[in-house]
């Protein structure tokens, strides 16, 4: 008789169908999850491969980004395939051991992901807002990532410990499901609130605070830089009195310089706007992708009658699984966007990816060297300007031209730096007044801004 009952039993989703099993739901979600799986895995594996292939890229910031990419890969492998299967078929096919292990690893990867986003925001905050404080070292970054994994494991441990594989008790239903089984509903709800705070509220608050301050500081520095360029231009216009006997090229050089200064101002404004947009996107995207999933989980947790998501009070109109799939897929889109926001938008990294996969490896090494040399050169050039060769010839016309150029250069340097500075005799007007002058006479805070912007964008 027992054999007959077992033979006649059916799986849960056939006895209690719901909208998540509709072909109109399965096909779109299958497409979305396949897209998130392959694109997320490709993006994060590429990020890890390119960064680890070039030791010069193992900076403090990139160590945290590597940590983020590793957790994203874990979510792509474990959360993206398994969660939709269990939501649609309401059955656990992976055995008792994996009932404890897979949810544990899923939880750890999610916590490491959100904790890493908070760590990246804090590191950038210290670099930009508190530039004179001691920055985190590579060793400190590695220790921080280890602590993040340990903390994630500790927070996830109660969840994994209380997971159990339970057999369906109804006679006509056969199969098992893997679910939480706590001693009391009170303890389960308390843990749910802790998870929501640790996984969403705290990281979101940290990111919002850090990036709001970074945007404020970078905007002020951009305004200061533009103001200095305006003062520099005014000083040059008032200092350079060109002779009226046919030296029109001087006026052409001045006009050319003014055009370059105007383009440089526009570049600073656009770069600041772009950086602001990226930082705001990071915070907003994290909020809109993780908030719905947390809200749905919270409602399900406190819905004792399990009727909140039942339309018309009917079991076959229970949309809780459908909503859970929808919000989960939105949350998992972070796996695709994180490599884009934190790596691909960096032009240097983008070139490295292209050169690594499609070009000469030596060219990608040169990109790294050029980036590091460029940042070093900014600081070095504040102490010394390398001029070109003197203008040759000893005629009166050439001598007059040289005196006028030197006079403009001396007056310009005085107005820019706020104190008398003897320029290198070889430096000419069209060299001193190039767009790079804003970097050559930049304050320490401005230099920090350039290097941090390289990291941000």
From Swiss-Prot:
GO terms for cellular component: axon; dendrite; neuron projection; neuronal cell body; plasma membrane. SUPFAM superfamilies: Family A G protein-coupled receptor-like (SSF81321). Keywords: Disulfide bond, G-protein coupled receptor, Membrane, Receptor, Transducer, Transmembrane, Transmembrane helix. G-protein coupled receptor for FARP(FMRFamide related peptide) neuropeptides. Activated by FARP neuropeptides flp-18 and flp-21. Plays a role in modulating social and feeding behavior. Required to modulate locomotion quiescence during the sleep-like state called lethargus, which occurs during molting between larval and adult stages, in part by regulating touch sensitivity. It comes from the Eukaryota. The keyword Transmembrane helix applies. Pfam families: 7tm_1. Residues 1-22, 84-100, 162-193, 301-324 are extracellular. It comes from Caenorhabditis elegans. This is Neuropeptide receptor npr-1.
